[in-house]
Amino acid sequence: MSPDHGELLYEGKAKRIYATDHPDQVLVEYKNDATAFNAQKKAQLADKGRLNCQISARLFELLEGQGVPSHYLGLAGDTWMLVQRVEVIPLEVVLRNIATGSLCRQTPIAEGTPINPALLDLYYKDDDLGDPLLTEARVRLLGLVDDARQSAIEQLARRINGVLQPFFDGLELQLVDFKLELGLNKAGELLLADEISPDTCRFWDQRSSDTNDRILDKDRFRKDLGGVMEAYGEVLKRVHTACPNPRNCL
């Protein structure tokens, strides 16, 4: 059941954003759409929206308890979330704790190599350009953020990793890497936005030694491994044990 909402403001690959009666708040609906390779691969996965919404809500509240500001205000249904309206900064911030994926394709670093301190990469958020990797000089050239804002973004991202990595270790999940999106609210405050879920994180199950069976994230969809929703459900099950009762705005 959907909450009362205003007009559709934006629809992306994984979420819809709707207006509310409050000009500084919007409702986010998590969709069942699955995409990979910049939407070249697509599918509908039943229950994906609910799982990602419920995981994200619990992790936003975990981070909030550790002083990390986010756009999250509370749940508004199984697949709905009330959030602050933010102006999204067109940078994707990726933290890498363990080498895998594009890092191993682009460098001679072996998959599974621990990275400490975590590698922080910045990507230009532009689907038409394929979200290219940026250098600091290119960030300045594009005028996306000034040096002070970039420093604040990187500090916040590392704080988030500093909370999430030991949290997931306690759940016997390795936080391999993850993507963050950040934005500015009406007051100009830098906030964590978007979501934190198996769509945006790589999780490896520490209870499994099999390189495919241990994958509990979107790589199961990318690699046609099957069991995608079972993997997402396992992540929610473990997160729920530590964060059982997220706020409800209804």
Swiss-Prot record:
<dbReference type="InterPro" id="IPR001636">
    <property type="entry name" value="SAICAR_synth"/>
</dbReference>
<dbReference type="Pfam" id="PF01259">
    <property type="entry name" value="SAICAR_synt"/>
</dbReference>
<dbReference type="InterPro" id="IPR028923">
    <property type="entry name" value="SAICAR_synt/ADE2_N"/>
</dbReference>
<keyword id="KW-0658">Purine biosynthesis</keyword>
<dbReference type="GO" id="GO:0006189">
    <property type="term" value="P:'de novo' IMP biosynthetic process"/>
</dbReference>
<comment type="pathway">
    <text>Purine metabolism; IMP biosynthesis via de novo pathway; 5-amino-1-(5-phospho-D-ribosyl)imidazole-4-carboxamide from 5-amino-1-(5-phospho-D-ribosyl)imidazole-4-carboxylate: step 1/2.</text>
</comment>
<dbReference type="GO" id="GO:0004639">
    <property type="term" value="F:phosphoribosylaminoimidazolesuccinocarboxamide synthase activity"/>
</dbReference>
<dbReference type="GO" id="GO:0009236">
    <property type="term" value="P:cobalamin biosynthetic process"/>
</dbReference>
<dbReference type="InterPro" id="IPR018236">
    <property type="entry name" value="SAICAR_synthetase_CS"/>
</dbReference>
<comment type="similarity">
    <text>Belongs to the SAICAR synthetase family.</text>
</comment>
<dbReference type="InterPro" id="IPR033934">
    <property type="entry name" value="SAICAR_synt_PurC"/>
</dbReference>
<keyword id="KW-0547">Nucleotide-binding</keyword>
<protein>
    <recommendedName>
        <fullName>Phosphoribosylaminoimidazole-succinocarboxamide synthase</fullName>
        <ecNumber>6.3.2.6</ecNumber>
    </recommendedName>
</protein>
<keyword id="KW-0436">Ligase</keyword>
<keyword id="KW-0067">ATP-binding</keyword>
<dbReference type="GO" id="GO:0005524">
    <property type="term" value="F:ATP binding"/>
</dbReference>
<dbReference type="InterPro" id="IPR050089">
    <property type="entry name" value="SAICAR_synthetase"/>
</dbReference>
